[in-house]
Amino acid sequence: MEGESTTAVISGFVFGALTFHHLNSGSDTEGFLLGDVMGEAKNSITDSQMDDVEVLYTIDIQKHVPCYQLSRFYNALGDLNIPELKKLLAGQKKSQNVIGWYKFRHNTEQIMTFRERLLHKNLQEHFSNSGLVFLLLTSNPATETKSTHRLEYALHKPQDGFFHKVPLVISNLGMSDQQGYKTLCGSCVSVGLNTAIKKHRLEFFNEDGALAEVNRISDMHMTLQEELKKTCSQLVESENSVEQLLEAVNDLKKQIAEKKLLMEEKGNKVSEDTEENVLLCEAFRRFFPQSALLQSCRLSLGGRQIPHSCSVSHNSSDVNELTLMVKQYDFPEAHRRQAGKRKAHSKQLGKTSTKKSRLPPFQRPQSDNSDSESSDSEKLLCTSGTETDGDIVQSLNVEVSRSKSPTF
């Protein structure tokens, strides 16, 4: 990508002479600027573009030629007076070219007039220089008493039919190359200074003339750089180890969460399988206190048999409400077995009068009026003297197979 930039440079001596001539004249003044235009191509290599060429033009204003009579080399229409123009520039050297012209105006603004534009176009055609510049200087009073004036100046250059301002730099006021520090010092001829330096030279300088402190600081800087590299490598290793540990911790957390879910699911199943049917256990103890076989049987709420016998008193508040009243259709086989055994018992009443019942008979407790109304659909479950423990367990197993949670 190619670009152009233009900068004008004027020495402090030339600029001071221009302002001196302007301030000592009673009217507007004008003249020509002499100097040279230099071009320099600057090639910058960037990441986006391999070649970035920029052309820098420097307008060096070296001298000015004043015109002591206003409008001497042109008329009111802006047409040039060629003979007067040649007389004005006759004594100049050939090495110094006309690079522009200037004009001082009192109490006006920094705007080119229409006549100045026409005159500038005619001067471009006469000198065959399309890069001709125009320096406009104006002065305005800065106070009401007009004791202080403000001087403004601008350098104009035509481009594409328009006049653009060109930066003007005064060399002894804004040139950075002349304001820089000197890196080399001149020879010192002072005898006293040489004596003082020789006396303390070994404390501050080495044998080769270099500053000792500078070398020490450079050595310390190199040592610090090496330590910094080591620390950076250790930091990278520690960061990598921390990342690995964090990944391992996250994996362990996931495994723990999965195990917790599995344990909760298993715990729910185990609790259903191992939780004892307390009401059934208390019912066996209350209604069959002398049957060790029934009291040794334990069933869970899910209907599964628990291998260990229960030896704990549950002390449930619902035990007092337990009865042996069950619905008739719950024990059809037990009802038929009991009816047949009652008939056999009536026939052999005399023979079995001496037999003792293993389980004491229990009569049905008195109930409310509501229980008496439903007595047709319920019956009393009791044992006779001829029933054995096997018969009782068989009857209970039939019921358990049909209903895993019997109602008492």
From Swiss-Prot:
Gene Ontology BP terms: attachment of spindle microtubules to kinetochore; chromatin organization; double-strand break repair; mitotic G2 DNA damage checkpoint signaling; mitotic spindle assembly; positive regulation of DNA repair; protein K63-linked deubiquitination; response to ionizing radiation
Biased amino acid composition, Polar residues: 394-408
InterPro entries: BRISC_Abraxas1, FAM175, MPN
Location of the protein in the cell: Nucleus
Domain MPN: 7-155
Region described as Disordered: 335-408
Locus of motif pSXXF motif: 405-408
Keyword vocabulary terms for this entry: Chromatin regulator, Coiled coil, DNA damage, DNA repair, Nucleus, Phosphoprotein
Residue positions, PTM Phosphoserine: 405
A Pfam family matched in the record: MPN_2A_DUB_like
PANTHER family, per database record: ABRAXAS FAMILY MEMBER, BRCA1-A COMPLEX SUBUNIT ABRAXAS 1
Role, per record: Involved in DNA damage response and double-strand break (DSB) repair. Component of the BRCA1-A complex, acting as a central scaffold protein that assembles the various components of the complex and mediates the recruitment of brca1. The BRCA1-A complex specifically recognizes 'Lys-63'-linked ubiquitinated histones H2A and H2AX at DNA lesion sites, leading to target the brca1-bard1 heterodimer to sites of DNA damage at DSBs. This complex also possesses deubiquitinase activity that specifically removes 'Lys-63'-linked ubiquitin on histones H2A and H2AX.
Protein name listed in UniProt: BRCA1-A complex subunit Abraxas 1
Gene name tied to this protein: abraxas1
